[in-house]
Swiss-Prot record:
The heterodimer acts as both an ATP-dependent DNA helicase and an ATP-dependent, dual-direction single-stranded exonuclease. Recognizes the chi site generating a DNA molecule suitable for the initiation of homologous recombination. This subunit has 5' -> 3' nuclease activity but not helicase activity. GO terms for molecular function: 5'-3' exonuclease activity; ATP binding; double-stranded DNA binding; helicase activity; hydrolase activity, acting on acid anhydrides. GO terms for biological process: double-strand break repair via homologous recombination. Pfam families: ADDB_N (PF21445), PDDEXK_1 (PF12705). InterPro entries: ADDB_N (IPR049035), DNA_helicase_suRexB (IPR014141), P-loop_NTPase (IPR027417), PDDEXK-like_dom_sf (IPR011604), PDDEXK_AddAB-type (IPR038726). Its EC number is 3.1.-.-. Heterodimer of AddA and RexB. Keywords: ATP-binding, DNA damage, DNA repair, DNA-binding, Exonuclease, Helicase, Hydrolase, Nuclease, Nucleotide-binding. Its cofactor is Mg(2+). It is an enzyme of class 3 (hydrolase). This is ATP-dependent helicase/deoxyribonuclease subunit B.
Amino acid sequence: MGLQFILGDATTDHAGTMATMVQANLQADSQNQIFYLVPNHIKFEAEVDLLKRLRAQAASVNGVYAQNRVQVLSFSRLAWYFLKNTALYQQPRLDRASNTMLVAKILGESKEELTIYAGEAHNTGFVTQLADQLSELVTGRITAEDLNTTVAALTPGDRHRAKLRDLGIILDHYEAEIGPYATNASLLSGLQQVMRNQDLSHTFIYLNDFNVFSASETGLVETMIETAAEVTVSLVLDKPYPAAPPVAPNLFLPAGRLYHRLYQKAKTMKVPIRLDRFAKPRPLSEGMKHLADWWQTSTNLQPQAPAQTAQNKEVELAVATDPYHELRTVARQIYQAVRQGARYRDFLILARRLDPYAAVIPAIFEEFNIPQFTDLERPMKDHPLVVLIESLFAIQDHDYQYQDVMRLLHTELLLPENMDIAAFRDALDTTDNHLVRTGITGKKRWTQTDPWRYFQRNPNADDSQLDPEADKTAQINAIKTLVADTVPQLLRQWQTAKTGREAAASLYQWLQTTGVIDQLNVWRQTANADGDLSRSQANEQAWDTFTQLLNDYATILGEADFNRDQFRELLAAGFASATYTQIPSTLDSVVISETGLVRLAKAKHVYVIGATNTAMPDVPNDSGVLNSEERQLLAAQLPDDRFLPEQGPTTTLGDPFINYLGFMAASEKLTLSYPMQNTQENSENQASPYFRQLAQALQLTPATWAPAGLGTSLKAVLGSQRAMLSDFVRAAGEAQHQKLPLSRSWQGVLASLKQTTLAPLAQKLAGSLTYQNDPGRLDPTLAVQLYGRDMNVSVSRLETYYRNQFEYFLKYGLLLQPRPEFELSPADTGSLFHAVLDQYLTQLRDAGQTLADVTAADVAAAVPPLVAAITKRPGYEILGSTHRMAYLTSRLSRLLIQVLTNMRQQQRRTGFRPMRTELQFGRIGDTRGLPGLSWPLPHGGRVNVRGKIDRLDVYRESDAQRFMVVDYKSTQHRFDDSDAYYGIALQMLTYVEAMANVPADPPFVPAGALYFHLQDPKFKFSTDLDLDIDRLKAFKYLGFLVAKDGADLAAVDKTISAETGGRSMMVPLGFKKDGAFNYNQSNILTPEDLSAYLLHNQALIIDAASRILAGDIALAPFQYGQESTVISNSDYQSIMLFDPATGFDHYNHVPKLKRKEVLGRVTTDPTQIPHHRQEDSQA
């Protein structure tokens, strides 16, 4: 037995020296066995490297070399090698996920004994942290008794007592619970026992690339030293420290402390200690040698030699604008180097923390076609299988809440039979919209036997439905059936399960019978077929983790009474700590890692990115369960063979060493960079002290890494075709912004790219530079396909066209609709008002009555039952969804009573009576009403206009039936002549024309078109307040009346007349004392005026239909003055992206006209369409 140290700083070749010793051992005796131990994450690389070196030394023929007496292993694989046939190794493994589950169980069961940790069993984040801490304590060989001894040594009032006491209780239970399991600590302990009982006289053990050991690993190494023929430990260390450990500041502090500990232990065990050997120098560039010297003298605070500029070419510093362009520049340089003969494996990219770069790494390296392996653990908690299981518990907890059910379905692991994934996604989107618009929730609704019906809530009153109901009804019922046939079955089994094993088995069987396991296999096979091994293994590992957790649960709590909440918490805790194991997709790839992970020093060029003052040196993390102060308290009570890793401020002493190893992993060149912008916190970064000191000591001027621009030479940004396209777009965009010509070289880049497979993308991106927000025109043939040769339209559609042609195309051509939401909207209340008013007035008409014939009490009694009946119809679910909505429904009922009561008052003052309500003309959906309006179009086809009149009031005379069109509005409306002239208010004139065209005897003669405001008016209190009169004024009809003189309107308001004069409180009508109309109080059109308006209205309808079928879809929203409501109130802003500030987008800017001007235009030529003038860029 014996102990041999191999020393040398990072400029030496430790692996080469050890390979020589290994070869000598192999040649010395054919019985000699070699165990070469390295950290687990570099085992494969180390094995390949050692075998290559042994082959070179053996000078094998044909380059073939085989060796069965050399084992390159990690500590865990060494345990497997010696223990694989023992009972200990056959015990179930307690990995991180199952360990977390076990700790969650212990916390739940021991909460009565605890004080500060009593309520933490449900906190999965803390449980994961506590599980790691307990594992660390066991690996540190620290027992519950050690914690209790520490507690006893503290003063009664010490603030650490309660925490350490709780931890001691938990650790005591933990030690008892882990007995049946194989843990890392128990395997290392078992390995020690086996090695003590085996003949290792021909066993030579080499340890390389370790700078620190845990207490369990230290104990194992000490056993090796005591039992093996020889143990050789290689340390990155400049000199031995036999008598005392190094004292800070010292670059080699961690390795020096390890040397001292092992040396003293060997001395205590009376094991021979060989003379230290020093590794030979490895091939390094002069710049890397100089860097090593500077790093050592700088850290050790020693005087430094003057810098030699010539020596520093191999060390570069750079400042990037942001993390994205920092990493992109690195990728570009690697791409260019490989084109000059380098290999991808020659490059290593390191960061102290990779988090700021994690999201952009895949995209950047894919853009440059560079294979890369990111050596970073990825958490498993977001895998669809984990989400599906979490959703099942949530569905049961929240009674089939919308978010939980949709989260389960969006995993795409639970699919209906005989439905492909595309059809499923479409059906799921439809169901999603249906649930949002109807508010369906709860097990009762999901499992009801009656099928759901898809419908559009409160469609436009005069418009047909846009959604194909039958197809969508089939889709939503396919999803409903999927949930109803699968989820309740499992939840019932959990409710009736007696033991934990029953519940675990039911979950596994459910996943099997519902096809979840099959779908996971499909994913894995698809990933394999695509060559995506990482994705394939992720699915496999997620399933393996899940089955292991189920097995652990069955082992730990299988026979106990089933507790569903505990089952959920244990699975959640297990998944929270689970991570994916990753493998490189190819041997020749760029490795991306963190400086805290040991790497073999085999790269030629190392890039260290993210060198900011918060990363280098690293900010100490003292957030564990045991902080640095508590660790020191504990260490004071422990013997030397029991200890925990350092944490907190003391770790900064080893930070220079960690970075030194990372920097010196390069043999030829080091590039150190940092981004000026912290994109995660939207702040500015400062350079690391290492960066600043290097710049000063080596007289280096940092390069600037910025995005490609006009001034960037083409040679500097040469990259893959896709990367060059990105750079071209940026450079060309800069040229356009600065109004400068684009250089010929950049123009040549685009020309070259258009000859490659990227041509379509290049053309598209290049076109974006000159893009103007102009939708152009539709081909007329396509327009006819969209809308039909014979256009069947509603008035509101045509008004939309005149407000914004492009919005019309989006809404009625592409049928785009905003996502409906489950909320009480004006459309809901308006729809309810219309329905109640229609039903009540129809009931009165059928009974031969009018509102004037009933009492206020009759109205108050009739409305609530009507409201109750209507709110039970499909589409009104929201009004009964909550107590608040029920209250709002009662308020709406009271408002309707008030509205009808005031209509009653109005009808007592007028001779007009409601003849019909909800009177339809033209075809709406599958129903027909009065004849619609129809006109031929200039280029063939017809335009057919449909609509629905809210109420038609009629006064019968001997030679005419005078009618007034009444339209209910939720906001106050007036008839605006200018709006009517420009086509944005076609409704009233169209309704008047539809009624005037109805054949009747005597004929229908228009008397007016009025708006009725459905409102809940409020009045200021005053002593002379007369509510009846004030309400009458508040509910006054607004619009226009038609008459030659006052006699035509005698029946409109019988309380006034041309003879007596006065002003109406219910319609826009007033008379002067001489009997003439008072136009300040009246809104009167003569029959001749109305005829001109109707002819113009007809011309507008024909013009709109013609332009729609001609493909006119200009993005030129209608505007008076500086109004922007057409855009600001639109549901399609995010599609239109209309912005006049760009100089490209323009309004259809028109002057606001008064009636006199409108009449002058329409009487001159009613068919003349208003000239649409676009504002200039200055308007």
